[in-house]
Amino acid sequence: MKKDDYLVEIRNVLKQNPFILVGVSDIEGEEICRFLKKEKIEFESVKLSNESPYWEEIPAEIKEKVNNIILSGRKVMSLCIGGNMPEAIFSIAAAWHAGPDEDKPYSPIEQLSLAIKKDISPYYRLIGANSRGFIYAMREEAAAMLKGFGARSKYKSILKDAGITDYDLEDYKQKVYDSGEAGMERIPETYRAGIGLVIREIRRKDRAAQGITQEQELQAERAVMKSYLIGSVTVVDMHDAKPAAVFDRLVETEKYGLLMLSANGGSYFLGPWSKVKKFEEHFPEGKVGGEPPIRGHWSGNYSRPLVVDFVESLEKVKDKSKLHEKSELFMKL
């Protein structure tokens, strides 16, 4: 389906005064709720875990309510909820694109904004980029936006929508910001500090929306300090830390590969799309997403030795005495 046809379909559903259910498991779900409130569109939200934002996890009373609404003949739209839901529900669950002709997939908030406003605000473009590819994708989106005519007005719009004040920006420049921060070189220097702060805030709010506590942030810092290398891939034994809290502190590793291993048997890999495809081929029951053909992420429940052995073979490691060299790409948040 072409983009214009798909957006017309969303608009047609919205014209029918649907019951809208928003799954909130991250910052995008929260921003969609704010957007709908601003547009004075009625909706109901349900809190879901970031690890399992699926229909199957929705409380029974809400499912019953939705089913009764469907039986009454009223249209139902769901946002940011995956899984096997009733076919009658019009679902905007994840990134959508029309194939190779599209520059990039649209996240749910971008789809909704295009359907209602016929445009995507600069801030929502960053939120969408965060959903597609986290920090790297946001940097690239900002670099693309802040060029040529209109760049300054877009920059001001981003700061305003992110809730960044002049005081916040000056404080950030004095205490934290380094103009030579890796990965920000493509963003014009005039806007670099402000965008750096906005990206940091989006990731902080995203982790908070996922339910990551201060104690889990500290757990992530401790785990990251013990990270090591298998070839060019950085490996972190997360124990009970959360993947987002670990990744945000090791973002520069994504260009080579980051493997996160949790205590409950979950494995998470982020890195170049070529390596993600290798994971997908070797572990077909895992889940894959991201921004092909540039970068992506894979996750699955496989034994630690199995995953580590695969990474060793992927990296063609022969001298295992150097497997535990420390990674130096730690970023203090």
How should each PLM-predicted stretch be described?
Residues 42-43, 88-100, 286-287:
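Active-site regions of enzymes building and remodeling cell-envelope glycoconjugates
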Residues 25-28, 51-53, 83-85, 101, ...:
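Short acidic, S/G/P-rich loop/turn micro-motifs used as interaction or catalytic elements
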Residues 95-181:
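Short alpha-helices
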Residues 42-88:
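N-terminal small/polar loop signature for handling phosphorylated ligands or for N-terminal nucleophile
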Residues 48-51, 98-102, 286-294:
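Short, acidic/turn-prone active-site loops that include or flank metal/cofactor-
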Residues 23-53:
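Short, charged N-terminal beta->alpha structural module
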Residues 2-22, 75, 87-88, 117-122, ...:
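Gly/His-enriched, cation/cofactor- and phosphate-binding structural elements
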